[in-house]
Amino acid sequence: MVLKMEIKWYVKRGFEDNLIDALNTYGSACVLGLAGMGKTTIARYIYTKLRREGVKVVYLTSDEESKTIKF
């Protein structure tokens, strides 16, 4: 399944390339932070960027209510 995520605008923070390098090196990455800090936006940006480059990407997210992981 390919998620349809559109990023209308995104302000790069300077570490996105490091995150992509980590994904290329280790095959996965975990984005942690406080609520409202932009974790989901960063993940969507990276997902969209890599998909456009032809990379196969799996986007995992946690459903807070049921505590399950969807992929």
Curated annotation (Swiss-Prot):
Family matches, as Pfam families: nSTAND3 (PF20720)
Record InterPro entries: nSTAND3 (IPR049050), P-loop_NTPase (IPR027417)
Protein name (Swiss-Prot/TrEMBL): Uncharacterized protein MJ1241
Record organism: Methanocaldococcus jannaschii (strain ATCC 43067 / DSM 2661 / JAL-1 / JCM 10045 / NBRC 100440) (Methanococcus jannaschii)
